[in-house]
């Protein structure tokens, strides 16, 4: 994915490049140095351009000089404060992704690291839905990402039948909130 992202900016970005990327707070310290080392270098990317033009195999050279690796939730906070909304004051930032749910208290002076929460994302609820469906349906080789798509749509085709997932989705989201989100937030939000 990183090479695909670099390829997408190759025609429009000035070199040397500066890259900012993020990891979930729970793993960001583990991977920060590795990611920096992997990204900060000259990248030679070969690709087949014939899928969208008449040219064949091409390559681009991209020089990455500066790399910043931050927790994803910090990136969310920066976007809220410096981006379009220009948020002010003290507030909690909640980020619910597929793999990770994160939250942090953001103050004018910065984030409060003791309020940082990093736990299971929506994949937890999707897996609960899969377990529920397996009780009455054969799911075959469907994985969590395919089920996530069905989770979002609210239906899935199983055994040539349209199965409505809205009630199951509502129940597993309620369970996900009660089992994962609420207990974790309760530890940092005491108002």
Language-model regions, residue ranges each:
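Nucleotide/phosphate-binding catalytic cleft detector across ATP-hydrolyzing
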Residues: 1-91, 110-124, 158-191
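A short mid-domain helix/strand-loop element embedded in enzyme catalytic domains
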Residues: 69-73, 97-102
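Short helix/loop capping segments that flank catalytic or ligand/cofactor-binding pockets
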Residues: 78-79, 102-104
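Short hydrophobic beta-strand that contains or immediately precedes a catalytic carboxylate
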Residues: 93-95
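Glycine-rich phosphate-binding loop plus the immediately following alpha-helix
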Residues: 98, 104-143
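A mobile "lid/hinge" subdomain adjacent to the ATP/sugar-phosphate binding pocket shared
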Residues: 133-173
């Amino acid at each position: 994915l990183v090479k695909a992202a670099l390829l997408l900016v190759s025609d429009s970005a000035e070199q040397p490049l500066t890259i900012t990327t993020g990891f979930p707070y729970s793993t960001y310290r583990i991977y920060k140095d590795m990611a920096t080392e992997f990204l900060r270098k000259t990248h030679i990317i070969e690709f087949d351009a014939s899928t969208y033009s008449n040219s064949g195999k091409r390559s681009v050279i991209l020089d990455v000089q500066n790399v910043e690796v931050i927790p994803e939730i910090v990136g969310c906070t920066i976007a809220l404060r410096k981006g379009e909304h220009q948020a002010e004051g003290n507030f909690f930032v909640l980020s619910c992704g597929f793999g990770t749910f994160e939250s942090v208290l953001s103050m004018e002076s910065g984030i409060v690291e003791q309020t940082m929460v990093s736990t299971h994302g929506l994949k937890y609820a999707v897996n609960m839905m899969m377990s529920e469906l397996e009780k009455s349906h054969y799911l075959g080789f469907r994985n969590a990402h395919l089920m996530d798509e069905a989770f979002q749509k609210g239906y899935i085709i199983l055994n040539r039948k349209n199965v409505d997932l809205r009630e199951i989705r509502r129940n597993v989201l309620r369970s996900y909130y009660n089992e994962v989100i609420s207990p974790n937030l309760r530890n940092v939000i005491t108002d």
